[in-house]
Swiss-Prot record:
Reaction equations catalysed: (S)-malate + NADP(+) = pyruvate + CO2 + NADPH; oxaloacetate + H(+) = pyruvate + CO2
Upper taxonomic lineage: Eukaryota, Viridiplantae, Streptophyta, Embryophyta, Tracheophyta
Involved pathway(s): Photosynthesis; C4 acid pathway
Keywords of this entry: Chloroplast, Metal-binding, NAD, NADP, Oxidoreductase, Plastid, Transit peptide
Molecular function GO terms recorded: malate dehydrogenase (decarboxylating) (NADP+) activity; metal ion binding; NAD binding; oxaloacetate decarboxylase activity
Protein name stated in the entry: NADP-dependent malic enzyme, chloroplastic
Cofactor annotation comment: Divalent metal cations. Prefers magnesium or manganese.
Species this chain originates from: Flaveria trinervia (Clustered yellowtops)
Gene name per UniProt: MOD1
Length: 648
C-alpha cells in the first residue's frame, strides 16, 4: 500500500496555476480516502490510502511513501471495485466519503452551469478568452434578442401547456436573465404558463416532473433546526419569502409538498412583473404531511412526507419556529407572503403575525385589492359609486371574505359610515346557503361579520332573486356554478351586470367568458381569475379581463421594499387597488376590459409601488429615509433588469 502523509492538499486555481500556501484548502479532519493510481491506459493499478493531517506544514516538505506489496499487480475491473476518477464514482465506492469541490469565481465549464451568470452563446469573444470558455461553445456569438426569439420559437413548438412550463423552468435553472427577458417581453403569452392555470397541473404532477430544487423544503423532521436550514440557502440578502404548506393549492385542494410550484411561480412574477431581484426571493414549502389519500397511497413519485397532515399545537410550534427564524436571519424588513394555506390556518396566521412581522396573504389581501381595482374600473362603465352597489358572493373562504372586507372598508372611507354599517351592502353564500344571523353559532369566526338579518335561503339562485345584487362575485373554487339561469337572472335585474368568476384554475371557474357574454346577450361586464380567449357575439369582439393577483402583489411587494416598510396596513391595500384602474383607457372599456393589458404591467407595478410606499411614509411605517421626491421614478430605478452584464 502507498501511504501519503501530507500537511495539506494543494488545489489548482480556476486559471490553472497552483495555489499559494495561504490559498490552499485546509482539511479539518484526518480521514483516509481510498483512491487509486492509474496506468497509461487509465486503469487502476494499486489501492492508495491517502491521509491528510489537519496541521499545516511546509508545502515543500518531503512526503513519505510506503508501497504495500501485498496488493496484486493486476488492475481491478472498474465494475468490480476499482475507482475510476477523483470522485470515486462506481458501485464499489458508493458508501465512501467524497468532497464536492467548488470554486468561488465561476469560470469555464462551471460558468456555463451557473444560471445567475450564464449567457450561453451571448458570451463575447473577449469574455470567452477571459473566462476559459474557448472551445466550450460553438464559435458563433448570438445577441440577447436573438436568443429570446429562438426560445419563443422552441416553446411554441410544444402543444401541451405542461411541456411549455417545463421548458420555462429548465430555462430558469440554466440562464436566469434570458428567462426573465423572455417572460417580460412575452408576458401575456407566458403568464398562463409559468402561473395559473398551468402551474396547477404542474403542482399535481410535481413529483413526476421534479428535477432540481428551486427553493427550501422545511418539514416536521426539521423542527429545532429551521434557522440552520435557512443558512443553507446560497443567497443571504433575502427581501421576499413566499411560503405555503400546500393544503389549499389554487382550487385543487391538498397537494402537500408538491405545492412548491406556487411559491416558485409567484416569485418569478415578483421579479418579472415587479422588478424584485431574483437573488432576493426565496420560495419555501412547509411540509407537515398531507391528507390527500392519492398522494399518500398511490403516488410512488410523491416527494413529501408520507403521513397525515399535522395540526394543532404541533403545527403551531413549527410555524412559530419558522416565523422567528426568518425574522432573525433576514431582519425586520423581510416580506413574508403566505400562499395557499387552508382557511383555518390562513386567517389565524395573518392575525397572529401581522403585528410582529411584515406579512401579507395574497389569497386574502392580494385578491381583495385586485378585485377592488376592477370594481373601481367597472363603475366607470356602469355609473354610480361603490356604496350604490349591492354585492353577492358565492364562496365565503379566504378570497371571498377578504374581498368583502376590503370593499366594505373602501365604502366606509368614501361615505364616512361605520365599517359595520358598510358591511351590510355585502352578502355571502357558502355551501349551506346565505350567511344570515340565525346561523351565527355554527359559523367560522371569519364568516361571522357577514351574518346579516334575513330569513335563511338555501339555494344560490334563490339568494340572487332575493338579494337582487348588482355585482356577482364567485370565489367558490367550484366550476360551472354560474349557470345559464344565474347569468340570465343577473341580466334581468341589471342593464350591465358585473360578473366576476374568480376561481382558479380554468377548470374551476364559475363560468367561461363565452357563457357570460352569450347568456347576458353581450351586456355583462365580465372578468375572471383565469384567462379566456376573446369572444365574438353578435358581430362584436369582447375581450374579458383577468382579475389576476399578478396585477397587485409584485408592485405591492416592491413598494414595501423601497420604503423599508415594517408592517402591512389595510390603507396600503386600498392605495394599491387604485393604480390598475387608473391605467384602463376608453379603448380598453370599448372592448369590455376593466383591467389594463399585461403588456404594461411593469409600469403598473411601478405606480402601485409608489402608492404603497407613499402610504407607508404617511403612516410612519417606512424605515428607509428620507422619502424620495418622485416615488414612481424611484421605483422604476430599483427594478431588476434582465439585461446581460459585461464580464471582465
Amino acid at each position: 500500500m502507498i501511504s501519503l502523509n501530507s500537511s495539506f492538499l494543494e488545489r489548482s486555481s480556476v486559471t490553472g496555476g497552483s495555489r499559494t500556501q495561504s490559498q490552499s484548502l485546509r482539511l479539518s479532519a484526518r480521514r483516509p480516502v481510498v483512491t487509486s493510481m492509474l496506468n497509461s491506459n487509465s486503469l487502476p493499478e494499486r489501492n492508495v490510502s491517502v491521509s491528510v493531517d489537519s496541521a499545516v506544514r511546509d508545502v515543500n516538505a518531503p512526503v513519505a511513501v510506503e508501497v504495500d506489496r501485498s496488493v496484486g499487480e493486476k488492475p481491478f475491473a472498474a465494475v468490480g471495485g476499482g475507482v475510476e476518477d477523483m470522485y470515486g464514482e462506481d458501485t464499489a465506492t458508493e458508501d465512501h466519503y467524497i468532497t464536492p469541490w467548488s470554486v468561488s469565481v465561476a469560470s469555464g465549464y462551471s460558468l456555463l452551469r451557473d444560471p445567475h451568470h450564464n449567457k450561453g452563446l451571448a458570451f463575447t469573444e473577449k469574455e470567452r478568452d477571459a473566462h476559459f470558455l474557448r472551445g466550450l461553445l460553438p464559435p458563433v456569438v448570438v445577441n440577447h434578442d436573438l436568443q429570446v426569439k429562438k426560445m419563443m420559437h422552441n416553446i411554441r413548438q410544444y402543444q401541451v401547456p405542461l411541456q411549455r412550463y417545463q421548458a420555462m423552468m429548465d430555462l430558469q435553472q440554466r440562464n436566469e436573465r434570458l428567462f426573465y427577458k423572455l417572460l417580460i417581453e412575452n408576458v401575456e403569452e407566458l403568464l398562463p404558463i409559468v402561473y395559473t392555470p398551468t402551474v396547477g397541473e404542474a403542482c399535481q404532477k410535481y413529483g413526476s416532473i421534479f428535477e432540481n430544487s428551486q427553493g427550501l423544503f422545511i418539514s416536521l423532521k426539521d423542527k429545532g433546526r429551521i434557522l440552520e436550514i435557512l443558512k443553507n440557502w446560497p443567497h443571504k440578502k433575502i427581501q421576499v419569502i413566499v411560503v405555503t404548506d400546500g393544503e389549499r393549492i389554487l382550487g385543487l385542494g391538498d397537494l402537500g409538498c408538491q405545492g412548491m410550484g406556487i411559491p416558485v411561480g409567484k416569485l418569478a412574477l415578483y421579479t418579472a412583473l415587479g422588478g424584485v431581484r431574483p437573488s432576493a426571493c426565496l420560495p419555501i414549502t412547509i411540509d407537515v404531511g398531507t391528507n390527500n389519500e392519492k398522494l399518500l397511497n398511490d403516488d410512488e413519485f410523491y416527494i413529501g412526507l408520507k403521513q397525515k397532515r399535522a395540526a394543532g399545537q404541533e403545527y403551531a410550534e413549527l410555524m412559530n419556529e419558522f416565523m422567528s427564524a426568518v425574522k432573525q436571519n433576514y431582519g425586520e424588513n423581510l416580506l413574508i407572503q403566505f400562499e395557499d394555506f387552508a382557511n383555518h390556518n390562513a386567517f389565524d396566521l395573518l392575525e397572529k403575525y401581522r403585528t410582529t412581522h411584515l406579512v401579507f396573504n395574497d389569497d386574502i389581501q392580494g385578491t381583495a385589492s385586485v378585485v377592488l381595482g376592477g370594481l373601481i374600473s367597472a363603475l366607470k362603465l356602469v355609473g354610480g359609486s361603490l356604496a350604490d352597489q349591492k354585492f353577492l358572493f358565492l364562496g365565503a373562504g379566504e378570497a371571498g371574505t377578504g374581498i368583502a372586507e376590503l370593499i366594505a372598508l373602501e365604502i366606509s372611507k368614501q361615505t364616512n359610515i361605520p365599517l359595520e354599517e358598510s358591511r351590510k351592502k355585502v352578502w355571502l353564500v357558502d355551501s349551506k346557503g346565505l350567511i344570515v344571523r340565525s346561523r351565527l353559532d355554527s359559523l367560522q369566526h371569519f364568516k361571522k361579520p357577514w351574518a346579516h338579518d334575513h330569513e335563511p335561503v338555501n339555494e344560490f339562485l334563490d339568494a340572487i332573486k332575493t338579494i337582487r345584487p348588482t355585482v356577482l362575485i364567485g370565489s367558490s373554487g367550484t366550476g360551472q356554478t354560474f349557470t345559464k339561469e344565474v347569468v340570465e337572472t343577473m341580466s334581468s335585474l341589471n342593464e350591465k351586470p358585473i360578473i366576476l368568476a374568480l376561481s382558479n384554475p380554468t377548470s374551476q371557474s364559475e363560468c367561461t367568458a363565452e357563457q357570460a357574454y352569450t347568456w347576458s346577450e353581450g351586456r355583462a361586464i365580465f372578468a375572471s381569475g383565469s384567462p379566456f380567449k376573446p369572444v365574438e357575439y353578435n358581430g362584436k369582439l369582447y375581450v374579458s379581463g383577468q382579475a389576476n393577483n399578478a396585477y397587485i402583489f409584485p408592485g405591492f411587494g416592491l413598494g414595501l421594499i423601497i420604503s423599508g416598510a415594517i408592517r402591512v396596513h389595510d390603507d396600503m391595500l386600498l392605495a394599491a387597488s387604485e393604480a390598475p384602474a387608473e391605467q384602463v383607457t376608453q379603448e380598453h372599456f370599448d372592448k369590455g376590459l376593466i383591467f389594463p393589458p399585461f403588456t404594461s404591467i411593469r409600469k403598473i407595478s411601478a405606480h402601485i409601488a409608489a402608492k404603497v410606499a407613499a402610504k407607508a411614509y404617511e403612516l410612519g411605517l417606512a424605515s428607509r429615509l428620507p422619502q424620495p421626491e418622485n416615488l414612481v421614478a424611484y421605483a422604476e430605478s430599483c427594478m431588476y433588469s434582465p439585461k446581460y452584464r459585461i464580464y471582465r
